[in-house]
């Protein structure tokens, strides 16, 4: 009976050590984080009343690295399938589209005091003919900032037929 208890305790200790090792190696390390913060002076946009017949609407938010170190955008996701986002880089490239589900990796590094544009695109027809009324949507941006790792941009639209 004592041998069984010893094996049980040794097994539990080994399991705990393995779990600790895996948790430490799967999470981001302190070297991956920076003190810089990604900001947007405008975090909300009102499209006002839009017609389904007019199709998609878009708005550009300006994202700025407000720190002294390069910051990396790691992920962009939207709150609904009716919303997509594109990153418009300073060299004229477009990264995206980023949506609600599987999106391409971002991995865009923004230098200190540099800005990029995030284009929010809303499809008023995505919910079909019954999708009228006020729609609130969000775009979530993940970064490697230790101070503020997430930025949320929001918009609202009153959809009519």
Segments from the language model and where they lie:
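Feature for long, exposed domains in two main contexts
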Residues: 2-161
């Amino acid at each position: 009976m004592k041998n069984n208890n010893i094996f049980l305790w040794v097994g539990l200790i080994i399991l705990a050590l393995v779990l600790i090792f895996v948790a430490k190696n799967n999470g981001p390390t302190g070297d991956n984080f920076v003190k810089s913060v990604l900001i947007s002076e405008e975090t909300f946009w009102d499209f006002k009343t839009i017609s389904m017949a007019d199709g998609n609407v878009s708005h550009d938010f300006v994202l700025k690295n407000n720190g002294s170190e390069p910051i990396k955008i790691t992920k962009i996701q939207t709150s609904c399938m009716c919303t997509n986002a594109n990153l418009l880089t300073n060299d004229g490239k477009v990264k995206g589209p980023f949506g609600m589900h599987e999106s391409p990796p971002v991995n865009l590094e923004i230098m200190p005091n540099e800005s990029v544009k995030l284009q929010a695109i809303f499809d008023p027809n995505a919910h079909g003919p019954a999708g009228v009324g006020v729609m609130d949507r969000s775009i979530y941006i993940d970064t490697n900032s230790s101070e503020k790792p997430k930025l949320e941009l929001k918009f609202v639209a009153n959809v009519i037929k």
